[in-house]
Amino acid sequence: MSQATKRKHVVKEVLGEHIVPSDQQQIVRVLRTPGNNLHEVETAQGQRFLVSMPSKYRKNIWIKRGDFLIVDPIEEGEKVKAEISFVLCKDHVRSLQKEGFWPEAFSEVAEKHNNNRNRQTQPELPAEPQLSGEESSSEDDSDLFVNTNRRQYRESEEESEEEEAA
């Protein structure tokens, strides 16, 4: 199986199905990623340990700090105590909350996590006085997309007058 085909099936599996954790599985939150496909997680009871990412998810699914996972316990591990079995997206979290499988300790964290992802990052620009006629329609750029990853340079009237005089 080629890498592209494998990626397609893994992504389809993660995004498509809604899974319910079994008795042995746990829902955990990612705290940090120390590397080597290991992730430090915290359970709803506050217990911290390392989990490993199976090879089918490596280079196909990316896990960030604050994401939620379903993990299977590993009995022979000292430091690594579980393996990731499913990565939960916000739709999965909502369905687990509706079905009553979501831990109460993660309820507030999940709400904050969803709100931060949905929040718009565009800063509001100060409103400029409206001009009449054609000038206002040609110079009104407030409905255009603003790239927040770039610096915004503002020209003062003095600079523009100096450029026109030269």
UniProtKB/Swiss-Prot annotation:
The modification Phosphothreonine is found at T33. PROSITE patterns: S1_IF1_TYPE. Plays a role into cellular response to oxidative stress. Decreases cell proliferation. Keywords: Nucleus, Phosphoprotein, RNA-binding. GO terms for cellular component: cytosol; nucleoplasm. Belongs to the EIF1AD family. Gene3D superfamilies: 1.10.1200.180, Nucleic acid-binding proteins. The gene is EIF1AD. Its main location: nucleus. A motif (Nuclear localization signal) lies at residues 6-12, 56-65. Residues 114-166 are annotated as: Disordered. This is Probable RNA-binding protein EIF1AD. It comes from the Eukaryota. Residues 156-166 have a biased composition (Acidic residues). It is found in: Nucleus. Pfam families: eIF-1a (PF01176). The keyword Nucleus applies. Interacts with GAPDH and STAT1.
